[in-house]
């Protein structure tokens, strides 16, 4: 049975997304001790999938490939920077630059599998043409409670002496481009 959830999608920061999603050693070292929101003992529960048709798993490389593809298909450079224009009423309107790679954070349950999120990605591709490039299930993030959890809280659990409230979620990195036209996908088409 399908379960309702939500996803929040923003332009992907291709230079830093991979470090957070893969939990690289450098990323883990750079997290301030006071801001630890990852339980290292739970990191082994995380899962990942890289689209085999993606080529290089490096997002920066993929971004550069998209820039070249846009130039070849449209004859124009990809509009990367935000710009301003005047509207009909004379007001200044900010127009966002192209976001060819976007990342969504999808709320999941503790028992959600990688196969479940892959099925979601396949449905996004079928409906809107946005291609999932990478999927990361994070089951090691959350926050520490100051005391005991509330009576109805069934997700929090004890780690040593402290209580931890998990934030189960998945990161889905999408290629938002139509590779036949060189233009970005419009979800309302």
List PLM regions with ranges:
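N-terminal nicking endonuclease/strand-transfer module with a His-rich metal-binding environment
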Residues: 1-189
